């Protein structure tokens, strides 16, 4: 098994990142290639999961180990494949997905891309007891930052733009609406 790769990002194409590790180039399927753009021609550590199925052998990759752990949990759900699991992780924060599972919020889960009500119910049923193993505890500032990013995405901004803007303007004691206002000003420049 390959747990992680440390190498230089050669290129990014069609949801895949090509990483050069000692002159061996690995093709890694990633959810949001925008997260990797800043690493082109730079070294990066990517946490990976090798998946063997009818389509062949594939490597799925994440910049954060917590996303890898959530991916592993999700692909363990009956009838939920790696592509669907990747869509779930790419479309929302780990914290909000875990929170929806813990709170048995089938409606929130079924609003995610490619997830219908039956699949959402199956995710809750199969993961509600084990998902708590993921340490996704977040402090108040981080919670506000995540909520501000989600608000900006809802308003139509690209997730990467929203992350960059919120992280740039958020101060420790800011209220959520202040963070959003500052980020909107930053994005309108």
UniProtKB/Swiss-Prot annotation:
It comes from the Bacteria. The RuvA-RuvB-RuvC complex processes Holliday junction (HJ) DNA during genetic recombination and DNA repair, while the RuvA-RuvB complex plays an important role in the rescue of blocked DNA replication forks via replication fork reversal (RFR). RuvA specifically binds to HJ cruciform DNA, conferring on it an open structure. The RuvB hexamer acts as an ATP-dependent pump, pulling dsDNA into and through the RuvAB complex. HJ branch migration allows RuvC to scan DNA until it finds its consensus sequence, where it cleaves and resolves the cruciform DNA. Residues 64-135 are annotated as: Domain II. Residues 1-63 are annotated as: Domain I. The lineage of its organism: Bacteria, Thermotogati, Thermotogota, Thermotogae, Thermotogales. Its main location: cytoplasm. GO terms for cellular component: cytoplasm; Holliday junction helicase complex; Holliday junction resolvase complex. SMART domains: HhH1 (SM00278). It is found in: Cytoplasm. GO terms for biological process: DNA recombination; DNA repair. Residues 135-139 are annotated as: Flexible linker. Residues 140-189 are annotated as: Domain III. Belongs to the RuvA family. Has three domains with a flexible linker between the domains II and III and assumes an 'L' shape. Domain III is highly mobile and contacts RuvB. InterPro entries: DNA_helicase_Holl-junc_RuvA_I, Hlx-hairpin-Hlx_DNA-bd_motif, NA-bd_OB-fold, RuvA, RuvA_2-like, RuvA_C, RuvA_C_sf. Keywords: Cytoplasm, DNA damage, DNA recombination, DNA repair, DNA-binding. This is Holliday junction branch migration complex subunit RuvA. GO terms for molecular function: ATP binding; four-way junction DNA binding; four-way junction helicase activity. Homotetramer. Forms an RuvA(8)-RuvB(12)-Holliday junction (HJ) complex. HJ DNA is sandwiched between 2 RuvA tetramers; dsDNA enters through RuvA and exits via RuvB. An RuvB hexamer assembles on each DNA strand where it exits the tetramer. Each RuvB hexamer is contacted by two RuvA subunits (via domain III) on 2 adjacent RuvB subunits; this complex drives branch migration. In the full resolvosome a probable DNA-RuvA(4)-RuvB(12)-RuvC(2) complex forms which resolves the HJ.
